[in-house]
Amino acid sequence: MRKLHFAEEAELFAYKAWHSLKLEPPADLERVAARLKIEVHEREFVPEIDGFYLRLPGAPPVIAVNNSYVKPLPRRRFTLAHEIGHHLLGRAISPDRRYFVFDSATPRRSILERACDRFATMLLMPEDLTRQYYQELSHNPSNRTAIMSARFGVSAWALRRRLRELGLSTWTRR
């Protein structure tokens, strides 16, 4: 059996999406899904469910994202990117069979779930552009997080986490 390296595959898939589709921030996730022939639906669910991915033999894959008023747009974008990650990374687990996963806000995350989060992070905030924008906004550190999170279409929390991951400070002097 082939050893699964989800984190490396997540990085590769995100890189390929940006370069093959010539994406610009904020990443057009509907375009990414369309290229992969994934149907995307927005529906209101119970607040505990962010979204789900479903693949059945003989049918197009489906992603449903919770568009409840309690789920802000940056959260829905992250969920959609995460579910696209399930489409790409789930093939290693179940290439030709049924595959269903729904995501909730539970703190316990499997290796695959963490890899899908990584894919979503890298798809929404590629390293090269994150570093570039961070440097470009060095003259405006007090507003940098707000400007960058709006540019990438992500929450300030997700951006700060990405900046820490890249070793870029989010601390500003007062």
Please provide the spans of the model-predicted regions.
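Active-site hotspot residues in diverse enzymes, especially metal/ion-binding acidic/histidine motifs
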Residues: 1-174
